[in-house]
Amino acid sequence: MTSTVISNRSKKPEVYTDSKYDFLYPHVDDPNFNVKIAQKKEFSETQYDGHIDTEMTIEEQAEKMCKSDFELAPHQLFVRNFLSFNTPYNSLLLYHGLGTGKTCSAITIAEEMREYLNQLGVSQRILVVASPNVQDNFKMQLFDESKLELENGFWKMNTCVGYKLLREVNPTNMKNMDRRKIVSQIRRIIAGSYLFLGYREFN
Protein backbone atom coordinates (compact mmCIF):
# COMPACT_ATOMS: atom_id res chain seq x y z
CA MET A 1 0.00 0.00 0.00
CA THR A 2 1.37 3.40 -0.92
CA SER A 3 0.41 6.83 0.23
CA THR A 4 0.82 10.06 -1.61
CA VAL A 5 1.36 13.40 0.04
CA ILE A 6 0.12 16.29 -2.04
CA SER A 7 1.65 19.62 -1.26
CA ASN A 8 -0.76 22.49 -1.02
CA ARG A 9 1.93 25.05 -1.83
CA SER A 10 0.65 25.36 -5.37
CA LYS A 11 -2.85 26.20 -4.12
CA LYS A 12 -3.75 29.84 -4.32
CA PRO A 13 -3.98 31.25 -0.78
CA GLU A 14 -7.31 32.60 0.34
CA VAL A 15 -7.40 36.37 0.15
CA TYR A 16 -9.73 37.88 2.73
CA THR A 17 -11.80 40.82 1.53
CA ASP A 18 -14.14 41.06 4.49
CA SER A 19 -13.40 44.11 6.67
CA LYS A 20 -13.46 41.97 9.81
CA TYR A 21 -10.03 40.65 8.75
CA ASP A 22 -8.49 44.11 8.36
CA PHE A 23 -6.40 43.60 11.50
CA LEU A 24 -4.44 40.82 9.73
CA TYR A 25 -1.38 41.47 7.62
CA PRO A 26 -2.30 41.09 3.94
CA HIS A 27 -1.10 38.07 1.99
CA VAL A 28 1.61 38.86 -0.57
CA ASP A 29 -0.68 37.60 -3.35
CA ASP A 30 -3.44 40.00 -2.36
CA PRO A 31 -4.11 42.34 -5.34
CA ASN A 32 -4.52 45.23 -2.86
CA PHE A 33 -1.36 44.35 -0.92
CA ASN A 34 0.31 47.76 -1.25
CA VAL A 35 -2.83 49.62 -0.14
CA LYS A 36 -3.48 47.32 2.83
CA ILE A 37 0.13 47.25 4.04
CA ALA A 38 0.33 51.06 3.85
CA GLN A 39 -2.64 51.29 6.24
CA LYS A 40 -0.76 49.47 9.00
CA LYS A 41 0.61 51.89 11.60
CA GLU A 42 4.23 50.72 11.41
CA PHE A 43 4.24 51.31 7.65
CA SER A 44 2.08 54.42 7.37
CA GLU A 45 4.50 56.19 9.74
CA THR A 46 7.38 55.62 7.30
CA GLN A 47 5.79 57.51 4.41
CA TYR A 48 7.62 60.48 2.94
CA ASP A 49 5.72 63.63 3.76
CA GLY A 50 6.79 65.17 0.44
CA HIS A 51 7.71 68.44 2.17
CA ILE A 52 10.59 70.40 0.65
CA ASP A 53 11.83 73.44 2.54
CA THR A 54 11.73 76.13 -0.14
CA GLU A 55 13.04 78.77 2.28
CA MET A 56 16.52 77.20 2.25
CA THR A 57 19.01 77.36 -0.60
CA ILE A 58 20.60 74.16 -1.91
CA GLU A 59 23.84 75.08 -0.13
CA GLU A 60 22.04 75.61 3.20
CA GLN A 61 20.13 72.34 2.81
CA ALA A 62 23.37 70.46 1.98
CA GLU A 63 25.13 72.01 5.00
CA LYS A 64 22.25 71.02 7.29
CA MET A 65 22.22 67.43 6.01
CA CYS A 66 26.00 67.03 6.28
CA LYS A 67 26.04 68.19 9.90
CA SER A 68 23.05 66.17 11.08
CA ASP A 69 23.38 62.76 12.75
CA PHE A 70 22.67 59.69 10.66
CA GLU A 71 19.01 58.68 10.52
CA LEU A 72 17.43 55.79 8.70
CA ALA A 73 15.47 57.02 5.70
CA PRO A 74 11.74 56.22 5.58
CA HIS A 75 12.22 53.48 2.98
CA GLN A 76 14.88 51.85 5.20
CA LEU A 77 12.52 51.94 8.19
CA PHE A 78 9.83 50.37 6.01
CA VAL A 79 12.15 47.49 5.04
CA ARG A 80 13.21 46.94 8.66
CA ASN A 81 9.59 46.88 9.84
CA PHE A 82 8.52 44.64 6.95
CA LEU A 83 11.01 41.91 7.87
CA SER A 84 10.62 42.23 11.64
CA PHE A 85 9.43 39.34 13.77
CA ASN A 86 6.10 41.10 14.21
CA THR A 87 5.08 40.38 10.61
CA PRO A 88 4.57 37.09 8.75
CA TYR A 89 6.96 38.15 5.96
CA ASN A 90 10.38 36.51 5.75
CA SER A 91 11.91 37.57 2.44
CA LEU A 92 12.27 40.64 0.29
CA LEU A 93 14.15 41.55 -2.89
CA LEU A 94 15.75 45.00 -2.69
CA TYR A 95 16.42 46.33 -6.15
CA HIS A 96 17.48 49.93 -6.64
CA GLY A 97 20.24 52.16 -7.95
CA LEU A 98 23.61 52.85 -6.36
CA GLY A 99 23.70 54.83 -3.13
CA THR A 100 20.05 54.38 -2.19
CA GLY A 101 20.71 52.62 1.12
CA LYS A 102 20.28 48.93 0.26
CA THR A 103 23.33 47.82 2.25
CA CYS A 104 22.30 49.88 5.26
CA SER A 105 18.80 48.40 5.04
CA ALA A 106 20.29 44.89 5.01
CA ILE A 107 22.51 45.71 8.00
CA THR A 108 19.54 47.07 9.95
CA ILE A 109 17.61 43.84 9.32
CA ALA A 110 20.64 41.70 10.19
CA GLU A 111 21.18 43.58 13.45
CA GLU A 112 17.51 43.11 14.41
CA MET A 113 17.97 39.39 13.73
CA ARG A 114 21.19 39.29 15.76
CA GLU A 115 19.50 40.95 18.72
CA TYR A 116 16.62 38.48 18.51
CA LEU A 117 18.99 35.49 18.37
CA ASN A 118 20.92 36.84 21.37
CA GLN A 119 17.69 37.11 23.37
CA LEU A 120 16.96 33.46 22.57
CA GLY A 121 20.51 32.43 23.50
CA VAL A 122 21.18 31.19 19.96
CA SER A 123 24.79 31.53 18.82
CA GLN A 124 24.10 30.99 15.12
CA ARG A 125 25.92 33.39 12.80
CA ILE A 126 24.19 35.51 10.18
CA LEU A 127 25.22 34.51 6.67
CA VAL A 128 26.17 37.25 4.22
CA VAL A 129 26.64 35.88 0.69
CA ALA A 130 28.11 38.47 -1.66
CA SER A 131 31.01 39.35 -3.92
CA PRO A 132 34.24 40.51 -2.21
CA ASN A 133 33.52 44.17 -3.03
CA VAL A 134 30.01 44.01 -1.58
CA GLN A 135 31.34 42.17 1.49
CA ASP A 136 33.90 44.92 2.08
CA ASN A 137 31.20 47.58 1.73
CA PHE A 138 28.92 45.68 4.13
CA LYS A 139 31.70 45.38 6.73
CA MET A 140 32.62 49.06 6.36
CA GLN A 141 29.03 50.22 6.84
CA LEU A 142 28.54 47.82 9.74
CA PHE A 143 31.60 49.17 11.54
CA ASP A 144 33.97 51.86 10.33
CA GLU A 145 36.48 52.64 13.08
CA SER A 146 37.37 55.95 11.39
CA LYS A 147 33.89 57.17 12.39
CA LEU A 148 34.55 56.65 16.10
CA GLU A 149 34.61 60.04 17.79
CA LEU A 150 35.23 60.95 21.42
CA GLU A 151 32.86 63.61 22.69
CA ASN A 152 32.85 64.69 26.36
CA GLY A 153 34.53 61.40 27.33
CA PHE A 154 32.02 59.21 25.48
CA TRP A 155 32.55 57.44 22.19
CA LYS A 156 30.00 58.00 19.46
CA MET A 157 29.62 56.55 16.00
CA ASN A 158 27.39 58.03 13.31
CA THR A 159 26.49 54.97 11.21
CA CYS A 160 23.40 52.98 10.23
CA VAL A 161 23.67 50.83 13.38
CA GLY A 162 23.93 53.95 15.51
CA TYR A 163 25.13 53.35 19.07
CA LYS A 164 24.05 49.70 19.14
CA LEU A 165 27.55 48.18 18.96
CA LEU A 166 28.97 50.79 21.34
CA ARG A 167 26.27 49.99 23.91
CA GLU A 168 27.20 46.31 23.71
CA VAL A 169 30.87 46.91 24.47
CA ASN A 170 30.13 49.63 27.03
CA PRO A 171 26.75 48.80 28.63
CA THR A 172 27.48 50.86 31.76
CA ASN A 173 28.39 53.94 29.69
CA MET A 174 31.87 54.33 31.18
CA LYS A 175 33.79 57.46 30.23
CA ASN A 176 37.12 57.57 28.39
CA MET A 177 37.27 53.91 27.39
CA ASP A 178 40.37 52.93 25.44
CA ARG A 179 39.76 53.23 21.68
CA ARG A 180 41.76 50.08 20.84
CA LYS A 181 39.73 48.07 23.35
CA ILE A 182 36.45 49.28 21.82
CA VAL A 183 37.61 48.49 18.27
CA SER A 184 38.83 44.99 19.18
CA GLN A 185 35.63 44.16 21.10
CA ILE A 186 33.37 45.34 18.27
CA ARG A 187 35.43 43.34 15.75
CA ARG A 188 35.06 40.29 18.00
CA ILE A 189 31.27 40.75 18.12
CA ILE A 190 31.09 41.01 14.32
CA ALA A 191 33.36 37.98 13.77
CA GLY A 192 31.22 35.92 16.13
CA SER A 193 27.91 37.10 14.67
CA TYR A 194 28.50 37.19 10.91
CA LEU A 195 29.84 34.72 8.37
CA PHE A 196 30.86 36.26 5.04
CA LEU A 197 30.92 33.95 2.02
CA GLY A 198 31.50 34.47 -1.69
CA TYR A 199 29.58 32.73 -4.44
CA ARG A 200 32.39 30.22 -5.08
CA GLU A 201 31.89 28.57 -1.69
CA PHE A 202 28.59 27.19 -3.03
CA ASN A 203 30.08 25.57 -6.16
Can you say where each PLM-predicted feature lies in the sequence?
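SF2 helicase/translocase NTPase motor core
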Residues: T2-V79, T87-L93, T100-N203
